[in-house]
Amino acid sequence: LTQTFYLFFFRNHSLVIERFQAYLKEYDKINISIITYYEIVSGLKHRDAQKQLTSFQEFVSYNTVLPLTTSSAIISADIYANLRNKGTPIDDIDILIAGIAIANDLIIVTNNIRDFGKIENLEIQDWSK
């Protein structure tokens, strides 16, 4: 799941919440990359949003934070090289999130289809539509 998913979720986007609840009925937990975790925590700290930070930390405690491993770093490096060679680079953070997802055989939930859609072998879902 990317940062945009959490923004939709914590802003009570009805369709995102509905799909989130359906997902949890089937899988029990959400997987969060350490990169997404960093993006959200750093953004909340920058805004001094302590209440939202506490809420997010509680949410995370019930779910799984996936680390950046050597395997996911190698996959990310392959993605980076492939996109650069095609002349279609995207942000390194998005590449790292994708590498973690591919290494763990997971789907990315995001509304950033423009960038994540450039990555081969990555399944994407947009729960906001």
Residue ranges and their predicted role:
Residues 22, 98, 102-129:
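Acidic, PIN/NYN-like endoribonuclease modules and their adjacent C-terminal/linker elements
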Residues 5, 36, 72, 97, ...:
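Alpha-helix capping/helix-boundary segments
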Residues 1-2, 33, 90-91, 112:
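Histidine- and aromatic-rich ligand-binding microenvironments
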Residues 1-32, 42-58, 63:
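Short, well-structured N-terminal submotif of metal-dependent ribonuclease cores
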Residues 31, 66, 125:
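General small-molecule cofactor/ligand-binding pocket signal
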Residues 2-3, 16, 40, 76, ...:
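Generic structural signal for small/hydrophobic residues in well-ordered secondary structure
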Residues 36, 48, 52, 72-75:
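Hydrophobic/aromatic residues within well-ordered alpha-helical segments
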Residues 64-109:
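Active-site neighborhoods of divalent-metal-dependent phosphate/nucleic-acid chemistry enzymes
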